[in-house]
Amino acid sequence: TLSVSSAASDVYKRQEVQRYVSRVLESLDTTQLQDAVLRLYTYRDKIKQKIKQLSEAYAAEAFQKQININKIQLQEHWQMKNRIVPGQTHHTIIQKSLYAKEGKMNDLEAEMIMSIASLPNVLFWHRNLERNKGFYINGFLNHYPDFIIVTKYGNVILLEVKGGHLTNEDSKAKIRLGNKWASLAGQRFKYFMVFRNHAIEGAYNFEAAKNLIRNL
């Protein structure tokens, strides 16, 4: 039998998941059913992925509806901690970091934040922590941006760094959420998803983002 893991059932009631799987199986012809038996785990993974997509689409739509009727509002209450305990720290110190040691970064992240930190208007930056330790945008998904940057003029920038291979649906969803957060948070708050060269819609390449940050 084809079954869906408890992770999917956490999103939908088990009966709804079972009904969806039944509809999928009923839509298959004899040849496809035989193929499903031979490639059981492939079909299972495809069904799980589809359920995840439907769940995320429903959550995004419901989230937008709640915003439209003023049921969701932003409040400025999150604060930087006096000290942090990253799981792993970055191996080098980059100027203007908020803490003596910041969390681990990959080469692209380190390259970008080092360049941004060199801008004269940047007051400090912080490598945001994940897994309930750092700041996250609480929307139709929980999004932990890579960096928090504060300028000398009081502007707060959330920066999400992406490699060229990460132009997927998850990136697009984070752009929608990040831009919505920035529009609701007020003029001082910005969200940039940044690619080294070729950005997807709603994001920026690095030079464009850096030029914007230079003027904030």
Please give the residue ranges for each predicted region.
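Intrinsically disordered, low-complexity, repeat-rich regions
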Residues: 3-143, 150-155, 162-216
